[in-house]
């Protein structure tokens, strides 16, 4: 039986290669709700609770370093020890997203436990037909009140890379250019507002054309215009409204170079 299982995994690896998104393909970022992408779209990013788009390279968004909004009750019931608490015992929340609590990644044991949960989510993404995963909040240590470090993030990221590749999924480095994601094993990058913060060069040096750049309307249109002039012919650059709402919803914006 063990031999057959090993043989099956070997065959699966040969049949389902790990492939990064098409370099420079037109991408759409649909985290606020799924909708039919425009015909020109080659790549779409959707939440792990959604379905992939048939015929379009689909990336599965997973909040891997913090709790997903609306799931804190599940974590409290099932894995309370993986929720980061400060020295007074209070949950450490992302100030920008107070529904999200940081995961406690300070020990190898906790990182392994969190990675097992993420792998189950990755497996669900793969089973539904997604080709890649985007684990968010790699930079959670910068909001941890000094409780987490970049070393904790790197160690956990390596586990996520192994988990994704075991499921035959490519995996994205989400933001955090100060960490060399290529050395950690990431296959491509999803970079938000890198033109605004002058970080895009760090991503293209690491990943070449395998970069999906998202600029947001609340920063104005100039950053998007500059990004298109600088990189629009080489990497995926798109403009979205901050809430990434579905098409047909008030405030919806989607532009590409």
Please provide the spans of the model-predicted regions.
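Secretory targeting and sorting signals
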Residues: 1-20
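Glycan-processing catalytic domains of CAZymes
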Residues: 15-257
């Amino acid at each position: 039986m063990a031999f057959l299982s090993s043989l099956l995994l070997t065959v699966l690896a040969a049949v389902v290669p790990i492939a990064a998104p098409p370099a420079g393909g037109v991408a759409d970022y649909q985290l606020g709700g799924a909708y039919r992408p425009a015909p020109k779209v080659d790549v779409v990013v959707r939440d792990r609770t959604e379905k992939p788009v048939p015929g379009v390279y689909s990336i599965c968004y997973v909040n891997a370093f913090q709790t997903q909004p609306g799931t804190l009750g599940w974590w409290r019931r099932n894995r309370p020890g993986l929720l980061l608490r400060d020295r007074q015992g209070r949950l450490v929340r992302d100030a920008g997203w107070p529904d999200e609590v940081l995961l406690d990644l300070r020990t190898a044991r906790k990182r392994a436990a969190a990675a097992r949960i993420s792998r189950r989510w990755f497996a669900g993404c793969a089973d539904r037909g997604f080709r890649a995963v985007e684990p968010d909040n790699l930079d959670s240590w910068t909001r941890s009140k000094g409780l987490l470090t970049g070393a904790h993030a790197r160690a956990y990221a390596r586990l996520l890379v192994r988990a994704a590749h075991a499921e035959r999924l490519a995996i994205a480095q989400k933001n955090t250019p100060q960490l060399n994601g290529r050395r950690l094993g990431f296959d491509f990058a999803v970079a938000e507002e890198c033109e605004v913060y002058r970080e895009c060069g760090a991503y293209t040096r690491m990943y070449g054309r395998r970069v999906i750049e998202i600029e947001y309307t609340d920063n104005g249109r100039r950053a998007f215009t500059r990004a298109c002039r600088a990189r629009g012919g080489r990497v995926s650059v798109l403009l979205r409204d901050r809430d990434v709402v579905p098409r047909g919803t008030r405030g919806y914006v989607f532009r590409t170079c």
